[in-house]
Swiss-Prot record:
Name of the molecule in the record: Hydroxycinnamoyl-CoA:5-hydroxyanthranilate N-hydroxycinnamoyltransferase HHT1
Organism of provenance: Avena sativa
Induction cue: Induced by the crown rust fungus Puccinia coronata and the phytotoxin victorin.
InterPro entries: CAT-like_dom_sf, Plant_Fungal_Acyltransferase
Similarity comment: Belongs to the plant acyltransferase family.
EC number: 2.3.1.302
Keyword line: Acyltransferase, Plant defense, Transferase
General function of this protein: Involved in the biosynthesis of avenanthramide phytoalexins, which are phenolic alkaloids found mainly in oats. Catalyzes the N-acylation of 5-hydroxyanthranilate with 4-coumaroyl-CoA or caffeoyl-CoA as acyl donors, forming avenanthramide A and avenanthramide C, respectively. Does not accept feruloyl-CoA as a substrate.
EC category name: transferase
Keyword Protease: no
Superkingdom of origin: Eukaryota
Length: 441
């Protein structure tokens, strides 16, 4: 598919904004230092199908400039303070807005919207060669297809926002674009996530310990260099409401039977299928990384518009033999880990991070999720389909590629039919087996 750039513009805030250095909390600094990619797809049809200004770039840029006034950190740049700690320089240098055409392409060409790295063509490339203060924290691209549909590709620097805050910005931008005021203004003060003084961690925090290595490997996985990686494959699997019901039918019932969240049940199934597809020995330790929003877990709860990263991580750890056993065993392991994530645990995590000499050493990446481990991030409770810029809701929103083997996402359905989709990256030989197992229940 050929994509040509129609225009490329730096959009700055529409009014004067505070020129400050924004301190980053510890959760802002243990996320990967890259731009998180995501892609929205919109089909042209119905009443909006005849709109000559469908996804009008000028209208979108004006709304973007308005949104950058209250969300002013998004228009800034990364910088270092005097101690070398990464902070945000709120200098209003702006964000990149690209308009492009794919004259031979159509929304239907993307099929089930599998998040392969090929989707990155729908997102502007960030040039990192000039150092952390040289590049915008947000880049967006509107790509027009021959069918009349549109893709909105977004890459957002992870130090600036987690999924919840990032969507708060995108959805506020879309509201402004269709003439609706911002519902919840951003709260920009990350000192709410300071560690206690003095910091007193009360838990061991295995989530920040090195990921288990494959038994028999020569050196710990977290300390290894960059070995030659096997080829990977990415796919997406849609489980209907009926499929999820059949999964639950495998669980114990009756008086006294445990009640499991949908995430715990689906997570146990994905963890089991991945472990079996990978051929893990029963005694092989495997860790599941579950991103957890701390907003409703911390006491007092954070303001609704808190803008930043409030992500903590639950990490169920078990031998593969237990994971590949009954669905209930896996779900119990996951749910027990999630239930520990209360106010005290989250504050303990903040304290633990405060005591670490180098937070960059804890940043997760390919070494974290690769075999025998897994990351499973749920977007089910995030408002990922609310970005209506005035021309309708997206028919799909998901990650704009999955960079790491062993990383997976759970996505809700755009039409609210109760289905859930699992997008996952695995070694190619493991994916062949995983495809046969994911619907075998």
């Amino acid at each position: 598919m050929k994509i040509t750039v129609r225009s490329s513009t730096v959009v700055v805030p529409a009014a004067e904004t505070p020129r400050v250095r924004l301190w980053n909390a510890n959760p802002d600094l243990v996320v990967p230092r890259f731009h998180t990619p995501s892609v929205y797809f919109y089909r042209r049809g119905g009443e909006d199908g005849g709109d000559a200004c469908y996804f009008d770039a000028g209208r979108m840029r004006r709304a973007l400039a308005e949104a950058l006034v209250p969300f002013y950190p998004m228009a800034g740049r990364l910088a270092h303070d005097e101690d070398g700690r990464v902070e945000i320089d709120c200098n209003a240098e702006g964000v990149l807005f690209v308009e492009a055409d794919a004259p031979d392409g159509a929304v239907d060409d993307f099929g089930d919207f599998v998040p392969t790295m090929g989707l990155k063509r729908l997102i502007p490339t960030v040039d990192f060669t000039g150092g952390i203060s040289s590049y915008p924290l947000l880049v967006v691209q509107v790509t027009h297809f021959k069918c009349g549909g549109v893709a909105l590709g977004i890459a957002m620097q992870h130090h600036v926002a987690d999924g919840f805050s990032g969507l708060h910005f995108i959805n506020s931008w879309s509201d402004l674009c269709r003439g609706v005021p911002i519902a919840v203004m951003p709260f920009i003060d990350r000192t709410l996530l300071r560690a206690r003084d003095p910091p007193v961690p009360t838990h061991p925090h295995i989530e920040y310990q090195p990921a288990p290595a494959m038994l028999g490997s020569e050196e710990p996985q977290a300390l290894a260099g960059k070995p030659e990686s096997p080829p990977t494959a990415v796919d997406i699997f849609k489980l209907s409401r009926s499929d999820l019901g059949r999964l639950r039918a495998q669980l114990p019932t009756g008086e006294g039977a445990p009640r499991f969240s949908t995430y715990a049940v689906l997570g146990a199934h994905v963890w089991r299928c991945a472990s079996l597809a990978r051929g893990l020995a029963p005694e092989q330790p495997t860790k599941l990384y579950c991103a957890t929003d701390g907003r409703q877990r911390l006491t007092p709860t954070h303001p609704d518009g808190y803008f930043g990263n409030v992500i903590f991580t639950a990490t169920p750890l078990a031998e593969a033999g237990k994971v590949t056993g009954s669905l209930a065993d896996g779900a119990t392991t996951i749910q027990d880990a999630l239930e520990k994530m209360d106010d005290e645990y989250c504050h303990s995590a903040l304290d633990y991070l405060e005591l670490q000499p180098d937070l960059s050493a804890l940043v997760r990446g390919a070494h974290t999720f690769r075999c025998p481990n897994l990351g499973l991030t749920s977007w089910v409770r995030l408002p990922i389909h609310d970005a209506d810029f005035g021309w309708g809701r997206p028919v799909f929103m998901g990650p704009g590629g999955i960079a790491y083997e062993g990383l997976a996402f759970v996505l809700p359905s755009a039409n609210r039919d109760g289905s859930l989709s699992v997008a996952i990256s695995l070694q190619a030989e493991h994916m062949e087996k995983f495809r046969k197992m994911i619907f075998d229940f």
